[in-house]
Regions:
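Donor-sugar nucleotide-binding helix/loop cap in glycosyltransferases
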Residues: 1-216
Length: 216
């Protein structure tokens, strides 16, 4: 994406790149704060102080090396700055590079200081090609050729969790994917069973190129 010789988006100007960065951050269990918030956090309301305490408790239980309350607090602060605009009006400014993923609309501020809200539902700038890339990446960690709709929606590290989609939005992405791509089949069976079948292997590099087809 940022290669000096052939770059799709060297100056971080395209929403595709922002969504890819979000996917890489929030689908990686090693990046605990990001992964926990988008996959495990029990509420759409995030309180920074409570979140810090939750992560400290998890760290103590899991015996994280080099963990301290201060390092986790800084991590939570970094997360908040990444996803929310620094100005009170929530507008994009020249200083918005400090909050590169704010324009994705995944996290919003509330009227309570230190509180944020996860925005679940349709994501207007999340393209079909980015969704397909994320789906394929998620699938690479699975062992089955068929995945249920529910697993794709609610499994930890899944596109449904990481992108905070609702079921209607997920269905729309899958239906569009089946129409435009020969790689996946979305089916609805008896009793309302919905599942996705991967019909062939796909090159990750090709999927990445597809995301930037207009400028590649």
């Amino acid at each position: 994406i940022f290669s000096k010789t052939k770059s799709f988006d060297p100056y971080l100007e395209r929403s595709e790149t922002l969504w890819l960065l979000h996917w890489m951050l929030a689908s990686d269990p090693m990046l605990t704060t990001w992964y926990y918030i988008f996959n495990y956090h029990p509420s759409i309301i995030i309180n920074k102080e409570k979140l810090t305490n939750e992560l400290v408790s998890i760290g103590k239980f899991s015996k994280w090396k080099g963990m301290s309350a201060n390092t986790i607090k800084r991590d939570v602060d970094c997360f908040a700055r990444t996803y929310t605009f620094s100005n009170k009006k929530g507008e994009f400014t020249e200083d918005s590079i400090e909050c590169p993923l704010a324009e994705l609309g995944l996290i919003s501020t509330t009227y309570t200081k230190g509180e944020y809200e996860i925005q679940k539902g349709p994501k207007l700038t999340l393209s079909d090609k980015i969704f397909e890339y994320a789906l394929n990446d998620y699938w690479s960690k699975q062992t089955n050729q068929i995945i249920t709709f529910e697993k794709l929606m609610y499994d930890y590290g899944s596109p449904g969790k990481v992108f905070q989609l609702d079921e209607k939005s997920m269905e729309q992405y899958l239906e569009k994917l089946e129409m435009d791509s020969k790689n996946f089949v979305f089916s609805k069976g008896a009793g309302g069973l919905r599942q996705i079948t991967k019909v062939k292997e796909i090159s990750e590099n090709q999927l990445l190129k597809n995301c930037y087809k207009k400028v590649a």
